[in-house]
């Protein structure tokens, strides 16, 4: 019995010692864990090198082909009045010491009161207001550059080269009275005759007094042939005869004048449609081009005229006359923006050589030339 008690006591002592050892081991483990956690908290985070975001590649600078000196001079002289109008007003705005939000608002007013059409005006204004940063808006150079770029975009109407390889190439010329239609035909005849073309004019405006005589005078000056009809006669028959003559006698171009009553005259539209049908009977596919002559001095009314004609007729080109005598030359922008019809020629003076193929780059450069923007209106 005594031995059993002794063994029990020894077992209890051993058990107590084991518990003490385990307790100490547990305390050491907790202490170590706390120390490790503390070290982790106090350990400075690794510095991760963050590379600055790469700046987006700058947009390629627009390459604008400069016109030759002679062309630039002609455009500059012909656009003097327009440059002295709304462009000069813009020049005064951007000439301020500080360009601010109020200046941009004034630009909107200038554009919308210019004869460039509301669509083109809004397109240019939004390109400046929304297309430039706040910093850029403080730079007159950046504003001018944006105005020029947007104007070039507006004028970038698809304009395939005139294909005169068809023999004869038949050109139908439209326009209301007084826009310079007959004079334009005479100048075109002179220009193409100088290129060695065999030209035949067609006096298809049989209703206007002296229209045939005027075209006949141009035929003499250009030394080209003409087909005439009877006064008040059927324009379609005159044009039919002319095209047949052009085919039979191997002419290069047949240029057809047409009646030019007011664009609101429904009877005129019917007559012009008949002319087109008859032309196609005389030569399949004729007319190959139909150009409309507009007077720049009429401003936005020119756009209205063209819209009315275009609603009933296929217009493939515009000739804009009298730019040199008008402050409304910016109407070219409205014509291209709203009609999507290419401007083929512009009139920059009275001489035959002043009727020039339209060069959008030369037009924009000489119209929005900062050096000339302060010219007197």
Regions found by a protein language model. Give the residues of each.
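P-loop/Walker A NTP-binding module and the surrounding RecA-like catalytic core of P-loop NTPases
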Residues: 119-122, 148-377
């Amino acid at each position: 019995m005594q031995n059993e008690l002794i063994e029990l006591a020894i077992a209890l002592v051993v058990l107590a010692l084991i518990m003490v050892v385990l307790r100490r081991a547990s305390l050491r483990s907790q202490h170590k864990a706390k120390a490790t956690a503390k070290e982790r908290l106090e350990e400075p985070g690794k510095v991760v090198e963050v590379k600055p975001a790469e700046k987006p590649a700058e947009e390629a600078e627009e390459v604008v082909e400069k016109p030759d000196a002679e062309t630039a001079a002609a455009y500059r002289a012909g656009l003097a009045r327009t440059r002295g109008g709304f462009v000069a007003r813009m020049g005064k705005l951007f000439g301020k010491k500080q360009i601010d939000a109020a200046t941009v608002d004034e630009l909107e007013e200038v554009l919308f009161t210019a004869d460039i059409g509301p669509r083109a005006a809004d397109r240019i204004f939004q390109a400046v207001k929304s297309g430039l940063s706040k910093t850029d808006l403080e730079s007159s150079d950046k504003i001018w550059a944006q105005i020029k770029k947007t104007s070039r975009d507006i004028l970038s109407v698809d304009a395939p080269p005139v294909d005169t390889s068809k023999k004869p190439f038949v050109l139908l010329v439209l326009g209301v009275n007084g826009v310079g239609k007959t004079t334009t035909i005479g100048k075109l005849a002179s220009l193409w005759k100088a290129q060695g073309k065999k030209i035949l004019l067609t006096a298809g405006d049989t209703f206007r007094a002296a229209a045939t005589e005027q075209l006949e005078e141009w035929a003499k000056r250009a030394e080209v042939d003409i087909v005439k009809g009877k006064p008040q006669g059927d324009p379609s028959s005159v044009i039919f005869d002319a095209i047949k003559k052009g085919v039979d006698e191997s002419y290069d171009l047949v240029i057809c004048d047409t009646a030019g009553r007011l664009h609101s005259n429904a009877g005129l539209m019917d007559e012009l449609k008949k002319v087109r049908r008859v032309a196609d009977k005389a030569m399949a596919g004729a007319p190959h081009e139909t150009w409309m002559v507009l007077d720049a001095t009429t401003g936005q009314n020119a756009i209205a005229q063209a819209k009315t004609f275009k609603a009933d007729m296929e217009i493939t080109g515009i000739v804009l006359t009298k730019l040199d005598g008008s402050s409304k030359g910016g109407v070219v922008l409205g014509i291209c923006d709203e009609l999507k019809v290419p401007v083929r020629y512009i009139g920059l003076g009275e001489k035959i050589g002043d009727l020039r193929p339209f060069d959008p780059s030369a037009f924009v450069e000489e119209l929005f030339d900062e050096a000339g923007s302060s010219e007197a209106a």
